[in-house]
């Protein structure tokens, strides 16, 4: 009678004896890591399948810092701001953690940003507004009085949201913020494919690669 199979158990670097005990008690046929660390030799020698976590878009800050133009981005829309007399200043980062995001004013903002008159529903011409980098604000020079306006802009993700969540919830101290890179970008795409091939060659004991953020 076969009493082994169809059970995968998680492990961690500080739970090796418990993992070995549960592997035997439950008849598990696979072990997966929880934190992406290397498997200790004791677990490699069990004969169980090894499921290894692989981070496709982070945990390589050296690359991320060397290629800041290929950091992941997202679009953010500001709240509605009402114009009165004179110019209207719309701050972009209100309510947004500067540890998490940074305004992308590197790319062509006239092409990629959008300022909308929400009262009329019309997008403003790029000549009707400008960006003040010192205050991280968009200034509409001659808005219609009492009309509401929003700005949609690109922001770099300078701290991976999953890593940020884990750091805050687990109260991690003195942990470097992991910067997510965009694997769709040309330099990072080529680097990521090379990095994955090198990982597979250097981890022959891994049966299944678990892609994660």
Map each language-model feature to its residues.
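Glycan-processing catalytic domains of CAZymes
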Residues: 1-213
